[in-house]
Amino acid sequence: MTAADRKLLESFGRALAAQKLRLVYQPKVSLKDGRLTRVEALVRWDDPELGPVSPSRFVPLAEQHGLIDPLTEWGLRTTLKQWRTWREQGLETRLAFNISAVSLQRLDFPDLVERMCRAMGVPTDRLVLELTEGATQPLVRLMDTLTRFRIKGMGLAIDDFGTGYSSLLQLRQLPFTEVKIDRCFVKDLPSAHDSRLIVRTIVDLAHGLGLVATAEGIETIEQLRCVRELGCDVVQGYLVAPPLDPGDLIGWDREFKKRWPALLSDESLELWGDVEADTLRQR
């Protein structure tokens, strides 16, 4: 381990123990009617000395040095508590929560998640657990764990689909409920013919297996229109909303419902041009 990584790990451990991390929530909406279908919980760490630290830096260290389980439990508990607050305020939605392949090696993990849902008063069918495609490789070991999640009523999404090496047979064998199409296939839409073909193929595959097809990284109206034309069910990205602080979600939902009818109309480019620019500047 480098000195920089050691310092980062020590700082992260202190931040986790002191609950100095925070969660933001990025909405996902249905392409059928613009309705909020779920929100994805995303961890953020703003260190006083290091500044904002990307999860791509601290999550791998947490996985390698025994901190991923406490991070997961803190994040899940915080997310479930926030769901209950939203519900008390009149907002109904589902939750999407990312889990590490390391956590999936725990035999008691499905039971732990179920107990946490029960303790927080959150029905298990309100929770969708997201796994990156790379995490699905040890299929024989994961099959039992993932099946137990499904038996308990939780949804399972395969994230960043198309960027790893999982076979179509493996996708069929695993009990997923949702496929998330990676943003690398979305960014060149609608002009790139090969990207259109790949997205169409993934959507057809997902629907053929009875899965929901979600497009990530939607940043322009043209991309939104294209994935809708290609048959996607759900979209997520900065055109819809950046990751939001929990207190901002209800206000966003109210305003987005007003904007949705015009989003796919001929006037939408004029109406939404400033929104696109503003949200992208927040990245």
List each language-model region with its residue ranges.
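Structural preference for long, well-ordered alpha-helical segments in enzyme cores
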Residues: 8, 41, 61-62, 75-83, ...
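Short, basic/aromatic recognition patches
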Residues: 2-26
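Conserved ATPase "switch" residues in P-loop NTPase domains
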Residues: 16, 87, 150
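Catalytic core of bacterial c-di-GMP phosphodiesterases, primarily the EAL and HD-GYP domains
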Residues: 31-40, 65-141, 217
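A short, well-structured catalytic beta-strand-centered motif of the EAL phosphodiesterase domain
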Residues: 22-60, 79, 114, 179, ...
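EAL-family c-di-GMP phosphodiesterase catalytic domain
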Residues: 1, 15, 31-35, 48, ...
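N-terminal sensory regulatory modules of PAS/LOV and PAS-like folds
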Residues: 12, 41, 55-58, 75, ...
